[in-house]
Amino acid sequence: MDPVAHQNVFPRDTLITPLIMMINNGVPVSTFIDVGAADGTFALTVLDAVNPSLRLLNIDAQETYAPSLARIEALLGEPYRITAVGEHDGTLRVNRPKHEYWLSTASHMGATGDTFELPCRKLDSLCAEVGVEGPCFIKLDVEGAEMGVLKGAEETLRDTCGLLIESPVRAAPGPQFLDIYAFLAARDFSLFDMVRLSHRGSDATLYQFYAVFIANRFDFRGRAPLRTKAQQAEVLAAVTERREHLRAEIPQMIASIKLKRAMVRTGDG
């Protein structure tokens, strides 16, 4: 199925659509690695909708997800690990979250005073232990701990074709999207897409989105023109029509502005 046809099943802004586009354009994926897998449903969606032959590695830090991930392993033979993922092998202490979805191993995410210890593994160590075969596509949903995971995945990234990363936009301390971008750009990845923009409920400002990266050696963009001839003709017609519409609105907008300025001067506005 081609990328346009897939959009009938998965709209353009879904988390799975960029992966579909990559695969449909010849990007090879052997293993899907989900760091922050929760109950494993996203990886199941990838297998069900994209390629049932993909290998999986589900990873989550919390025991509460073990029964779901163990069931996937028992029925499909796809391994899982219950461990935090970071830049060292050992343990770390984390703050207990208000909901299991929001567990973060990142120290900058704030202290609650209620902490507990978790095992911690580098992604490189886990992939070697499981025997992961590349090229890999990696999903990271780790609540602010993205840089730690990436720093412990140097070897894995060398055999990775793409990544889907929940990316923060923060005013508070901690890594930003630009830090993630710079780290991956230095390792020959390019930004491929951005989906699922999320906005703060209090003031509607952007606080996170999912960034998609592609390994430069697999980047297919540029092989085809920006648009087909038919699409280009449609765009030209649309922008011509839009300009005429905007020009027609100029007198009304000027009149409205003059009226509002007059009201301000007289104290009525």
Model-derived features: where do they sit?
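Phosphate/nucleotide-binding beta-alpha loop and adjacent structural elements of enzyme active sites
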Residues: M1-G269
